[in-house]
Amino acid sequence: MPYHEFEVSKCIPERREHAVMKAAGEDLTSCLPKGYLNTIPGTISERGCAYCGAKHVIGTPMKDVIHISHGPNGCTYDTWQTKRYISDNDNFQLKYTFATDVKEKHVVFGAEGLLKKSMHEAFDAFPNIKRMTVYQTCTTALIGDDVDAIAKEVMEERGDVDVFVCNSPGFAGPSQSGGHHKINIAWLNQKVGTVEPDYLGEHVINYVGEYNIQGDQEVMIDYFNRMGIQVLSTFTGNGSYDSLRMMHRAHLNVLECARSAEYICDELRARYGIPRLDIDGFGFEPLANSLRKVALFFGIEDKAEAIIAEEYAKWKPQLDWYKERLKGKKVCLWPGGSKLWHWAHAIEEEMGLKVVSVYTKFGHQGDMEKGVSRCGEGALAIDDPNELESVEAIEMLKPDIIFTGKRPGEFVKKHGVPYLNAHAYHNGPYKGFEGWVRFARDIYNAIYSPMRQLAALDISAPDAAITSGFRTAKMNADLTVSDEVKFSEVLHEYTGKYDSIAEIRARNQPMPPSRKLRDAVQPAAE
């Protein structure tokens, strides 16, 4: 068993089984680290809690909803505005967050009255918003507040509102992944099947496990619209509360992030017979194959092929321009969950990068299995790393860039390594054909930034300003390519706009052919 023991964690021997170095000819039965277990006492984990997984990851991207946390303000603040899940309703869910602000007296005497008062105040403050999600936290779960009963009372008193209750306190799982499961099943049990659509087209999908980071969802919806597919709901990025209550009427669940949303897909299949189809919106070849799979399900392959041909012709020469300049650069792929396997093979094959490490903070064994299988010999795989282990890995592997979250990204920069935000992006969207070129552009800019040269200078030297001029990114990158590539008339840099989403929103999408209207919809299966 090729376990990798970090020097900094020798005092915690249990950590040894949570990191492996992939050896030559290794099969997955002998090179997987342990995963999705409780954090070992003594190691400072970078994980979030189950409440965070429910509210921050899945709940809050819903756009037309008052999201209120029943607990202390700290829980609310920690899950506010750290992910860029934009929406087409002026980003209401990003601008405003709500909390009941539970204090010591409420812990002693109960906080149900406070919750009810806060819910009414929130609805009064935003009279145009008629939907609300209430999130239970550790504090109010431990004192036994009956949030479901309070939600029912508020709905009865106001008449025109609807409230969803998410009971996912922080202790409900070993990481945020526990919260993913909680909110998936709670939404299905409480809300799916409670609203019927006015309109159903010939080809209808739910787009599941997509959170519209900097517009990812809107890019993918544009492809589906161009194929003549009606997207009934998106779970949950840029999705509306009531459309998600109609999920039972789709013909197909198209699943993007399996780690956070496979649970609701599997239950929709079991309860309503809706098939599940896993796709990948990152990378040219994975995305092209994903569009083909969806098209094949509906028998509209020609429409998918037309889109793929158009997008390849426009964006592939630009991707290849960056690939020539990124070949051989080493990357540590340290995101949260499924991106470690969504990205690992695509960035190697399509950008020329070499993945030297993958890690996950809340991924399960299945995520590691897929991630490690897509890495080459010598890749270091780590489950639930702490900061000191990450630093030791950086010193050992010497990556040129790291893809990770904002918190680890800050200490990564202190070690002289550039990072790109794998959770919320730098200049996204990164999904779609153009998005993948934007990602390559951001990698290129980060690796070849003159700031890296300046950061390495000893500015205390008296002649530093004279002897240490710096080169531009393009000058540095072009040192590594041939003249044929450098002066190619086919390959060229990214030509898209800074905001690639505004144009998508401005398009007039044709309504797909009608299959049946609401009065023809039969009651959902029990």
Curated annotation (Swiss-Prot):
<protein>
    <recommendedName>
        <fullName>Nitrogenase iron-iron protein alpha chain</fullName>
        <ecNumber>1.18.6.1</ecNumber>
    </recommendedName>
</protein>
<dbReference type="Pfam" id="PF00148">
    <property type="entry name" value="Oxidored_nitro"/>
</dbReference>
<feature type="binding site">
    <location>
        <position position="75"/>
    </location>
    <ligand>
        <name>[8Fe-7S] cluster</name>
    </ligand>
</feature>
<feature type="binding site">
    <location>
        <position position="257"/>
    </location>
    <ligand>
        <name>[8Fe-9S-C-homocitryl] cluster</name>
    </ligand>
</feature>
<feature type="binding site">
    <location>
        <position position="49"/>
    </location>
    <ligand>
        <name>[8Fe-7S] cluster</name>
    </ligand>
</feature>
<dbReference type="GO" id="GO:0009399">
    <property type="term" value="P:nitrogen fixation"/>
</dbReference>
<dbReference type="GO" id="GO:0005524">
    <property type="term" value="F:ATP binding"/>
</dbReference>
<feature type="region of interest" description="Disordered">
    <location>
        <begin position="507"/>
        <end position="526"/>
    </location>
</feature>
<keyword id="KW-0547">Nucleotide-binding</keyword>
<feature type="binding site">
    <location>
        <position position="423"/>
    </location>
    <ligand>
        <name>[8Fe-9S-C-homocitryl] cluster</name>
    </ligand>
</feature>
<dbReference type="InterPro" id="IPR000510">
    <property type="entry name" value="Nase/OxRdtase_comp1"/>
</dbReference>
<dbReference type="InterPro" id="IPR011290">
    <property type="entry name" value="Nase_Fe-Fe_asu"/>
</dbReference>
<dbReference type="InterPro" id="IPR010143">
    <property type="entry name" value="Nase_comp1_asu"/>
</dbReference>
<comment type="function">
    <text>This iron-iron protein is part of the nitrogenase complex that catalyzes the key enzymatic reactions in nitrogen fixation. Other nitrogenase complexes utilize a molybdenum-iron protein or a vanadium-iron protein.</text>
</comment>
<keyword id="KW-0411">Iron-sulfur</keyword>
<keyword id="KW-0067">ATP-binding</keyword>
<comment type="subunit">
    <text>Hexamer of two alpha, two beta, and two delta chains.</text>
</comment>
<dbReference type="InterPro" id="IPR000318">
    <property type="entry name" value="Nase_comp1_CS"/>
</dbReference>
<dbReference type="GO" id="GO:0046872">
    <property type="term" value="F:metal ion binding"/>
</dbReference>
<keyword id="KW-0560">Oxidoreductase</keyword>
<keyword id="KW-0408">Iron</keyword>
<dbReference type="InterPro" id="IPR005974">
    <property type="entry name" value="Nase_asu"/>
</dbReference>
<feature type="binding site">
    <location>
        <position position="138"/>
    </location>
    <ligand>
        <name>[8Fe-7S] cluster</name>
    </ligand>
</feature>
<comment type="similarity">
    <text>Belongs to the NifD/NifK/NifE/NifN family.</text>
</comment>
<keyword id="KW-0535">Nitrogen fixation</keyword>
<dbReference type="GO" id="GO:0051536">
    <property type="term" value="F:iron-sulfur cluster binding"/>
</dbReference>
<keyword id="KW-0479">Metal-binding</keyword>
<dbReference type="GO" id="GO:0016163">
    <property type="term" value="F:nitrogenase activity"/>
</dbReference>
